[in-house]
From Swiss-Prot:
Distribution of this protein across tissues and organs: Component of the acid-soluble organic matrix of calcified layers of the shell (at protein level).
Superkingdom of this protein's organism: Eukaryota
Signal peptide interval: 1-20
Protein name: Uncharacterized shell protein 22
The keyword Chaperone belongs to this UniProt entry's keyword annotation: no
Residues listed as glycosylation sites in the UniProt record: 28
Localization of this protein: Secreted
Residue ranges, compositional bias (Polar residues): 112-123, 151-176
Record's compositionally biased regions (Low complexity): 29-43, 74-104
Predominant cellular place of this UniProt entry's protein: secreted
């Protein structure tokens, strides 16, 4: 134990001595180097001499690349501009039900239904014979109506809820009548709640 303390003390003294010597030397060297560098530095912002600068190829290519891009843009815009012609018009013309010029119809192989009078109502995917465009124009013929809204089961719609086992009561505005027996709420499409 005594030997260990003695060795530790000797090492500590040596470390302090060496550190002091190197610290003095470092301070002396740093002071002399700082004085030399201060004398060699020019006043103001230090700029790299032009002869020492390495040329940047990207900066040298910029003007030519911009010119190439501009030439390419001009050529594309010249190609995109439509050439004027004597027959060019924006208004569509109909001949024998076929549309020419302007916006083309959705089904170019079929006559225009609005011009030929062959329009038969809205598009119905269940009817294979109806190939008209899925658009709506004018009144729909009665035989083409596939949806009839259910009347509301209220007094305002023309009839009252019948009592069980009785016929439905007509109201003054001649609305449709409901059959006798249990009925459903046609407006909400839900069965009545059973208590």
């Amino acid at each position: 134990m005594l030997k260990f303390r003695l060795i530790l003390t000797v090492l500590t003294v040596l470390l302090i001595t060496v550190n002091g010597q190197f610290g003095v030397n470092i301070e002396n060297k740093s002071s002399t180097s700082s004085s030399k560098s201060a004398a060699s530095k020019p006043s103001g912002n230090f700029a790299i001499p032009t002869a020492l600068r390495r040329p940047n190829p990207f900066l040298q290519r910029l003007p030519s690349a911009a010119a190439d891009q501009e030439a390419l843009f001009q050529s594309k815009t010249a190609q995109a501009q439509p050439q004027p012609s004597a027959q060019s018009t924006n208004k569509p013309s109909f001949q024998n039900g076929q549309q020419s010029g302007g916006n083309q119809p959705m089904y170019p192989n079929q006559p225009d239904p609005y011009q030929t009078g062959s329009y038969q109502g809205p598009y119905n995917s269940m009817n294979s014979n109806n190939n008209n465009p899925p658009t709506m124009a004018g009144p729909v013929p009665a035989d083409r109506i596939s949806y009839q809204p259910a009347p509301k089961n209220t007094v305002q719609s023309g009839y009252q809820q019948p009592m069980p086992g009785q016929q439905s009561m007509q109201v003054p505005n001649n609305g449709p009548s409901l059959p006798a027996g249990p009925s459903y709420d046609l407006h909400n499409q839900y069965p009545p709640q059973q208590n």
